[in-house]
UniProtKB/Swiss-Prot annotation:
Domain of life: Bacteria
InterPro entries on file: Restrct_endonuc-II-like (IPR011335), tRNA_endonuc-like_dom_sf (IPR011856), UPF0102_YraN-like (IPR003509)
NCBIfam families named among the record's database cross-references: PRK12497.1-3, YraN family protein
Protein name: UPF0102 protein XF_0554
Lineage of producing organism: Bacteria, Pseudomonadati, Pseudomonadota, Gammaproteobacteria, Lysobacterales
Protein's organism: Xylella fastidiosa (strain 9a5c)
HAMAP family named in the record: UPF0102 (MF_00048)
One Gene Ontology molecular-function label: nucleic acid binding
Cross-referenced Pfam families: UPF0102
Family to which this protein belongs: Belongs to the UPF0102 family.
Length: 121
């Protein structure tokens, strides 16, 4: 049986593969900054996509996507800004924030494109 960290890593790998099959290109994983982390950074037809991957075995407390609250969105935006500062060639490209939620066993993935916008933070 996988512990929480191993389970999270497995869901992130599954999410990355799912997005790659959909045509996105992988740029980075688990990019850490003070105060925030980007699970996946992908590229999709002239857009940089910052992807938050969430997993819940059960939805007793809401869906995994619902757990990306205003505070978490702010952290993701700050981390994305720092990422773009370190990669200025990508800062000229539009960006968006997606969420991939995983639930259950066997794992079911649900990709939410454009899950939130900067003005939602």
């Amino acid at each position: 049986m996988l512990n929480r960290r191993e389970c999270g890593a497995a869901v992130e790998v599954a999410a990355r593969r799912h997005l790659e099959r959909a045509g996105l290109r992988w740029l980075a994983s688990n990019v850490c900054f003070r105060g925030g982390e980007l699970d996946l950074v992908m590229y999709d037809v002239m857009s940089v996509v910052f992807v938050e991957v969430r997993y819940r075995q059960q939805e007793n407390h809401g869906s995994a996507a619902q757990s990306v609250d205003r505070r978490k969105r702010r952290k993701l935006v700050m981390a994305a800004q720092l990422f773009l500062q370190r990669h200025p060639f990508l800062a000229q490209v539009p960006c968006r924030f997606d969420v991939v939620e995983g639930a259950g066993r066997p794992l079911q993935l649900h990709w939410i494109r454009d899950a939130f916008r900067l003005d939602d933070c």
